[in-house]
Amino acid sequence: MVWNTNLRWRLPVTCLLLQVALVVLFGVFVRYDMDADPHWIDKKEAENSTSDMENEFYYRYPSFQDVHVMIFVGFGFLMTFLQRYGYSSVGFNFLLAAFGIQWALLLQGWFHSYYRGYIRVGVENLINADFCVGSVCVAFGAVLGKVSPVQLLIMTLFQVTLFSVNEFILLNLLEVKDAGGSMTIHTFGAYFGLTVTWILYRPGLHQSKERQSSVYHSDLFAMIGTLFLWMYWPSFNSAVSNHGDAQHRAAINTYCSLAACVLTSVALSSALHKKGKLDMVHIQNATLAGGVAVGTAAEMMLMPYGSLIVGFICGIVSTLGFVYLTPFLESRLRVQDTCGIHNLHGIPGIIGAIVGAVTASCANTDVYGVNGLTQAFGFDGFKTNRTPSMQGKFQAAGLFVSLAMALVGGIIVGIILKLPFWGQPADENCFEDAIYWEMPEEPKSTVLHPEDSTLKPSEP
């Protein structure tokens, strides 16, 4: 089938309509929160909170910076491994994230910070909006190279909506703990994206197989994304934790899990190659799986050795997934997972949910202390009668809710994106920047390098 990929009207109209709608909605509903609005100074004085240094900005902004870099630089560059899709990997990630954070501020605001007729926005809202967009970036990895920017905007519109509903169910109704988003961000984002790409299955994708591979410099750019993600993941998992020991624990647990994951990923990558060589795909992706898997239990008393075990297991599972599971999914289940998000986010997200459920079930006053247990899991108010074993069951329920929302939502959104007027590329043109970008002319070299006798001058 021949597709019309000309976006001259479709993309501008879609972008402008969405942005104008957001401007109107922000004007009607969004206002600054107490820490950003001088009108609340009297209330602060009544609460003896008059020091500017007590403003939430100074507690949260460093973490916000780190998370923001992960979303726009980390995820963007991680997907530049495709040899002729670098512009689109970074550029489309930039586009969907910029739209997604605005839409997320509205939807999450209606669910979590709606007060006296307005959504109150502060720095913590910005972090949560980035988390929401992180889930979209995960799903983007599954459809990378096979969809148009208009399709990505439509997918973001629906996914942010579904994410916000799922997050509200888990955090507000089930009261689960998921500081680093193993369930809400990674599991939901991965299986949503995998379901969408399953619906959008392309039987003729083999025609673009040559462009689906990497070259030396594209892998190097992708490794930059990996390093940014790896360095800032402790901030990601601890960004919205309660101040004090919980936030401190989240950073330590993530740090340890990531470190262990690198060694096992390298070990497995070498062991699985017949000549003992390393595969850059494994090093770019599997080394991050420990950060995903420790997310749910990040605030809990997992202990540093427990975090090392989680990272150790995920390095093995993720690397094996890239070697064996990804080809199986494509050949048998018609799931064309471009970036292998099932191995980096899907399976590690499920492992993280299980680790969180088990760790919560095993919690006791000997480990946390009486007040510490109450504070760590919020066993007060209407949760006074909840026990650690009950909390573990709610944690497990949260995993199934996330999976159900991802699968059902992915099917619906996939069907919408399959409509023929979104400007998607033909099978033979997938993974190609030139379809949507003005490309610079590549200069023809006429210089002979004497040290290499095989080189010939370019044809005129």
From Swiss-Prot:
It catalyses: NH4(+)(in) = NH4(+)(out); methylamine(out) = methylamine(in); CO2(out) = CO2(in). Keywords: Ammonia transport, Cell membrane, Glycoprotein, Membrane, Transmembrane, Transmembrane helix, Transport. GO terms for cellular component: apical plasma membrane; basolateral plasma membrane; cytoplasmic vesicle; plasma membrane. One of its GO terms (molecular function) is carbon dioxide transmembrane transporter activity. It is a multi-pass membrane protein. It is found in: Apical cell membrane. The chain crosses the membrane at residues 10-30, 62-82, 91-111, 126-145, 152-174, 180-200, 220-240, 252-272, 286-306, 308-328, 340-360, 397-417. N-glycosylated. It holds the Pfam family Ammonium_transp. Residues 31-61, 112-125, 175-179, 241-251, 307, 361-396 are extracellular. The keyword Transport applies. GO terms for biological process: ammonium homeostasis; ammonium transmembrane transport. The keyword Transit peptide does not apply. Ammonium transporter involved in the maintenance of acid-base homeostasis. Transports ammonium and its related derivative methylammonium across the plasma membrane of epithelial cells likely contributing to renal transepithelial ammonia transport and ammonia metabolism. Postulated to primarily mediate an electroneutral bidirectional transport of NH3 ammonia species according to a mechanism that implies interaction of an NH4(+) ion with acidic residues of the pore entry followed by dissociation of NH4(+) into NH3 and H(+). Homotrimer. This is Ammonium transporter Rh type C. It comes from Canis lupus familiaris. The lineage of its organism: Eukaryota, Metazoa, Chordata, Craniata, Vertebrata. The gene is RHCG.
